[in-house]
Amino acid sequence: MSTKLKGPDGRIPDRLPDGSPAVSWERRWTEGSLPLWLVATVGGMAVLSVLGLFFFGSFTGVGSA
């Protein structure tokens, strides 16, 4: 990313002086160390795995009697 686009506080402004977007919409969703869609996908899979483990445990083991 270009350093000349950054403001005094280090953030990238939404618009350039001519009114055009400072960052294209394709790059806005993939900025940062990890893309947000990747974090959300891994988090969702973890939640589904834990819920599946609880359902599996309800049919087997101590609580199944």
UniProtKB/Swiss-Prot annotation:
TM region positions: 36-56
InterPro entries named among the record's database cross-references: PSII_PsbJ, PSII_PsbJ_sf
Region (Disordered): 1-21
Compartments where located: Cellular thylakoid membrane
Primary residence: membrane
HAMAP family documented for this protein: PSII_PsbJ (MF_01305)
Free-text function comment from the UniProt entry: One of the components of the core complex of photosystem II (PSII). PSII is a light-driven water:plastoquinone oxidoreductase that uses light energy to abstract electrons from H(2)O, generating O(2) and a proton gradient subsequently used for ATP formation. It consists of a core antenna complex that captures photons, and an electron transfer chain that converts photonic excitation into a charge separation.
Database matches in NCBIfam families: PRK02565.1 (NF002722)
Entry's family note: Belongs to the PsbJ family.
Protein known as: Photosystem II reaction center protein J
Organism: Prochlorococcus marinus (strain MIT 9313)
Gene: psbJ
